[in-house]
Amino acid sequence: LIDLIEYLAPRRVLINKGNHEVRFGSYLARSLDGELKELMPETALDLIVNDGFHHYDKRTRTKIWYQPIRDVFEGVDISYTGDWWCKLGKTIFAHPLAYSGGILKTSEKAANHFLRMDPDFDALVLAHTHKLGMYREGNITLFEQGCCCLTEKMDYADGKLTMPQQKGFLYLCQDGEGRLLFDRTRLVTF
């Protein structure tokens, strides 16, 4: 995330929670006593973005303080939404728990969901699938934004006959009214 922010140099960063954060929160809920659980935030992103944290290295008996990422970049408004989706201008950014194996099918399902909730959007940017793609349906452009992680180190899909993950990200541009500037928007692959 830090490398991506440095590379793009955005003015604003919105961070949604995703299935990995939900999974970690569920693990803590199962593993910790009720009172201890109250000491922990809902997701690790609360610590990374808002609160900062100490990393305790028990082997070397040291602890290192990591300040909140929102304090690391001067002039960049970084916030954690605490939700699986948010809307900026006329673009919805979402990281649903749902998944469909068809090409861009998860994006289509998400668009149908949001059309029932708030039909005033012209773009939907979807995380979760770790795929890169785009298509237009009517007046809405759907994107799957890829992933910026080290996919070669992620073996949780090994043996599940899934399509390879696609490294990359979406560089999305909007006009002053928050409308998608399609000709300036790019899917970037690594």
Listing of model-derived features with the role each one plays in the protein:
Residues 97-188:
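Conserved beta-sheet core of the metallophosphoesterase superfamily
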Residues 2-123, 147:
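Conserved catalytic scaffold of divalent metal-dependent phosphoesterases
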